[in-house]
């Protein structure tokens, strides 16, 4: 996939310096990545949407953080249960999920 229609970044950081407050990794962000991949596959969107885990975005208190490009929309306090709504509303229908947007 050279030019995906959407690119989803999920913070999976487990910052070890003790200064951050959220620790996305400890809030099951790896499960969020897996759920995105499963949801996209079930909707036959895997060839159009790339999902990557990433390091800290610097706003741990609102994590887990998900960022969707090309729109540059940031979502906070995301759980695996929110993934279906993000895929259906944002990816398929172009509508930002306002309740999660930061």
Swiss-Prot record:
Name recorded for this polypeptide: Ferredoxin, 2Fe-2S
Q: Does the keyword Cell wall biogenesis/degradation apply?
A: no
Q: What role is this protein assigned?
A: Ferredoxins are iron-sulfur proteins that transfer electrons in a wide variety of metabolic reactions.
Assigned keywords, A-Z: 2Fe-2S, Electron transport, Iron, Iron-sulfur, Metal-binding, Transport
Could you tell me the superkingdom of the organism this chain comes from? Bacteria
Q: Tell me the SUPFAM superfamilies matching this sequence.
A: Thioredoxin-like (SSF52833)
InterPro entries, alphabetically?
Fdxn_Clost-type, Thioredoxin-like_sf
Q: Which GO terms describe its molecular function?
A: 2 iron, 2 sulfur cluster binding; metal ion binding
The annotation note on the cofactor reads: Binds 1 [2Fe-2S] cluster.
CDD domains named among the record's database cross-references: TRX_Fd_family
What residues does [2Fe-2S] cluster bind to? 11, 24, 56, 60
Pfam families recorded: 2Fe-2S_thioredx
The UniProt similarity line reads:
Belongs to the 2Fe2S Shethna-type ferredoxin family.
- Cofactor dependency: [2Fe-2S] cluster
Please tell me the species this chain comes from. Answer: Clostridium pasteurianum
Q: Which PANTHER family match?
A: NADH-QUINONE OXIDOREDUCTASE SUBUNIT F
């Amino acid at each position: 996939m050279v030019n995906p229609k959407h690119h989803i970044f999920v913070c999976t950081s487990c910052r070890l310096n003790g200064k951050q407050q959220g620790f996305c990794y400890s809030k099951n962000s790896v499960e969020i990545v897996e759920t995105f991949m499963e949801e996209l596959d079930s909707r036959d969107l895997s060839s159009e949407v790339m999902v990557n885990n990433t390091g800290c975005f610097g706003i741990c208190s609102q994590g887990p953080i998900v960022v969707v490009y090309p729109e540059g929309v940031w979502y906070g306090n995301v759980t695996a249960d929110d993934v279906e709504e993000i895929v259906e509303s944002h990816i398929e229908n172009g509508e930002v999920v306002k309740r999660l947007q930061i």
